Design a protein with these regions (language model features):
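N-terminal auxiliary segments of SAM/dcSAM-dependent transferases
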Residues: 2-67
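Conserved class I S-adenosyl-L-methionine
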Residues: 53-113, 128-132, 136, 154-157, ...
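Class I SAM-dependent methyltransferase SAM/SAH-binding core
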Residues: 118-179
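Short beta->alpha hinge that forms the Motif I/post-I loop of the SAM-binding pocket
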Residues: 150, 201, 224
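A short acidic, Gly/Pro-enriched loop at the edge of an enzyme's catalytic core
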Residues: 178-190
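A short SAM/SAH-binding and catalytic strip from SAM-dependent methyltransferases
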Residues: 189-201
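A short glycine-rich, Lys/Arg-flanked "PGG" loop and its adjoining helix->strand segment in the class I
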Residues: 203-215
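C-terminal alpha-helical "lid/dimerization" subdomain adjacent to the S-adenosyl-L-methionine
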Residues: 220-277
Length: 285
């Protein structure tokens, strides 16, 4: 992450602008802190990774999920590859291809002026979607990719994956989905895969995604929901419950969408996963 990238961030406590205080490594952030110009709070940066999390405000459920994902991080990719086909009835790639078109990346067009387009993945995890973004984006388009996660373990796996990535760089940071460290309306696409069912406050998480998305842009959320066609199957009920042990009811959070959400589509993309797409219209619409 460069100094210019850091200028696109905002204080997660007050949303004020941040200034970097510390050392640089080949023009990228090294170690130091991002200090808020408004509230003067300092947010640490270690080895180029900003940590923009107010730990006192992280919900208990999210703390638990962070510990779980930190522990599972080294096993996440191989276990997913092995178990996804027999449980989901399709390959991992086919399931991801079920929601990627909802981002409508091919319809992106350059902004007026020199500002690049920006795409945010909330809960980037081990970075499995990064190559799919690169695949679906127009090649000559100036696009910044941003990814955040609460789990240091998953971000470490993501950074390892990106060492071999030959496309656009992914700007990574540690952050809480309930308090995204960005100004309002600064992303041209926002999406999240596989975590909102474990959020302490899903309504707040959806509101934050909507806040940082530009008006009328697709916001795509994917997580666990048992396909109605398999709800009478004891096997699938047991397996789904094991997969979602942390949540009393894992369903598409349509009821938690921000007021005024339009273009709402909730669909099943595999046996155990839904895809929810919505937009927030312009205020003058």
């Amino acid at each position: 992450m460069t100094l210019a990238d850091a200028g696109a961030l905002a204080c997660p406590a007050c949303r004020g602008p941040l200034e970097f205080e510390g050392t640089l490594a080949d023009g990228d952030l090294g170690s130091g802190a991002l200090r808020c110009v408004r509230c003067v709070r300092a947010w640490p940066v270690h080895d180029g990774l900003p940590r923009l999390v107010d730990e006192a405000r992280v919900p208990r459920a999210d703390r638990f999920m962070r510990v779980l994902y930190d522990w599972l991080a080294p096993l996440h990719d191989p276990v997913t590859r092995a178990l996804f086909p027999p449980l989901q009835g399709t390959s991992e790639r086919a399931a991801r291809d079920g929601y990627m078109p909802r981002l409508a990346l091919g319809s992106l067009r350059p902004l007026d002026g020199a500002e690049p387009l920006r795409i945010l993945e909330v809960g980037v995890g081990a970075g499995a979607n990064v190559p799919l973004l690169e695949r679906d984006l127009p090649r000559d388009l100036d696009v910044e990719l941003w990814g955040l996660d609460l789990s240091d373990g998953m971000l470490d796996r993501c950074r390892r994956r990106l060492v071999h990535h030959r496309g656009r760089p992914m700007r990574l940071l540690v952050a809480d989905a309930h308090a995204l460290p960005f100004p309002d309306a600064c992303f041209d696409r926002v999406f999240h895969v596989g975590g909102i069912g474990g959020y302490g406050n899903p309504r707040r998480g959806l509101a934050e995604m909507a806040r940082v998305a530009r008006p009328d842009t697709p916001i795509v959320v994917v997580d666990e929901q048992l396909d109605p066609e398999h709800r009478d199957s004891p096997f699938h009920r047991v397996m789904f419950r094991a997969l979602t042990f942390y949540s009393a009811a894992s369903t598409s959070p349509v009821a938690h969408l921000p007021p005024g959400a339009t273009g709402v589509v909730s669909e099943q993309v595999s046996r155990y996963y839904y895809c929810l797409t919505f937009r927030i219209p312009r205020h003058d619409a």
